[in-house]
Amino acid sequence: MTLRLSRRAYAEMFGPTTGDRVRLADTELLIEIERDFTTYGEEVKFGGGKVIRDGMGQSQRVAADVPDTVITNAVILDHWGIVKADIAIKHGRIAAIGKAGNPDIQPGVTIAIGAATEVIAGEGLIVTAGGIDTHIHFISPQQIDEALASGVTTMLGGGTGPATGTNATTCTPGPWHMERMLQAADGWPINLGFLGKGNASLPQPLVEQIAAGAIGLKLHEDWGTTPAAIDNCLSVADDTDTQVAIHTDTLNEAGFVESTVAAFKGRTIHTYHTEGAGGGHAPDILKVCGEMNVLPSSTNPTRPYTINTLDEHLDMLMVCHHLDPSIAEDLAFAESRIRRETIAAEDILHDLGALSMLSSDSQAMGRVGEVIIRTWQTAHKMKVQRGALPEDTARNDNFRAKRYVAKYTINPALTHGIAHEVGSIEPGKWADLVLWEPAFFGIKPSMILKGGMIAVAQMGDPNASIPTPQPVHYREMFATRGGALARTSLTFVSQMAADAGIAERYGLAKRIVPVRNCRNVTKADMIHNAWRPSISVDPETYDVIADGQLLTCEPATVLPMAQRYFLF
């Protein structure tokens, strides 16, 4: 017997299906379900009187033949699509995306549920891959709590704590600091990787940091990013299959942007602060977006351009870079980096896919818990100001959503050689997943899974009779305790360090994973974010021209995902 349900009734019971649209938080962004992997009339759902019961939606298969966990009827938002599906997790990895149930009695089942299977109800929820923040100043370990609760599950960068060097630069300098930070990584339920200091003109000081466990090297102007240092650093990276991140020379002391590009010699590099105010060659660092070997990112303090952006930047900059406002030269240095015209252009370059990644610059002018919020605020602002992208339709913003989610998931993973483990929702990858109610999308996740186990969730009073009574706030779950912590999170290192046996030598508990294929990534590999415009910046007016078009927009006076959701 067939029972017809209205779309509303179906969505309320099983979540949206093909052709249904979902608003992302309180933005003007709408996503539309492109495909539903489930079977109408055969959907599985857990609960009293529902489907996942013995002999019904649950089969008799043993643990070896069923997943450890199934997320049912979830909407997946990833760079490759926007679909409705059941997600299977086994041994900490995504095992399948498809139709869950009991294949003995149900048609089309690709994921068998058994007595060994836990269920997470995904009906009405959006699932995204855990975010990857590639611009972390490891100033305080409490950043990790904030990042994880925001939906970020991998943090890459450098530092040693609130040292003056770390306050300004993302470097973990030298083998001793590298060993200590890798040991500290064992205590946190998040994937971590550390960059060594790349500012040296001879190879050995850099090679020893890679051998100690660095996933790559960071060149920063505060340590002297000269053409000689750039050339040497990239040569070491080529020899060790690691990535180089660079914060270029704001003062143009050792040369202009053309000198830096020449020092790259066509070699792959991740350019931090390819943006309007964060640093690097003033005023035209944005030019590097047009280079095939440059993988550009920007940071969240300028995301998106608002009426308050300029006002807050000067004081932030003076503190972060150890400048003295009473010294005229220090003040001039700061003011040269803060330009409304290039900040406005940064919005548009993100929207057109010229800027491939977005990160935080945590506690060093950026906010570690706001990478995801500010990504989607930028997408909203551009939708409102520029309308639909050519790739989208009047019904949805699917392409724009895929472009923006890729900026903090798959593209950072590809850039830093970790896409074989994280960065997308695909079978075989580590099950770092973030579940969102659509009304709170991008702002407050419902639950964060690390390696297939719940790490953080919104949880009510532990003494209550049910999980939901107030106060409801983020609390660490069992994946953050005891031996489970080391088995649900990863530490990324160089292949050289892994081969040298640092895990045993340092006494590391977490599984170490070598980065790979860092040196053959190009701008063309940046998914949905591969545009390479020819950019010029007027040295007097700071106007930004890309492929002959002036890039400018007005600052936002109000944003979504803001005061509706936060008291403070």
Curated annotation (Swiss-Prot):
Urease domain span: 130-568
Active site: residue positions: 321 (proton donor)
Modified-residue entries (N6-carboxylysine), positions: 218
GO molecular function: nickel cation binding; urease activity
Keyword tags: Cytoplasm, Hydrolase, Metal-binding, Nickel
Entry comment on modification after translation: Carboxylation allows a single lysine to coordinate two nickel ions.
Pathway(s) served: Nitrogen metabolism; urea degradation; CO(2) and NH(3) from urea (urease route): step 1/1
InterPro entries: Amidohydro-rel, Metal-dep_hydrolase_composite, Metal_Hydrolase, Urease_alpha_N_dom, Urease_alpha_subunit, Urease_AS, Urease_asu, Urease_asu_c
Entry's cofactor comment: Binds 2 nickel ions per subunit.
Chain residues that bind substrate: 220
HAMAP family, per the entry: Urease_alpha (MF_01953)
Protein name: Urease subunit alpha
Originating species: Burkholderia cenocepacia (strain HI2424)
Gene transcribed to yield this protein: ureC
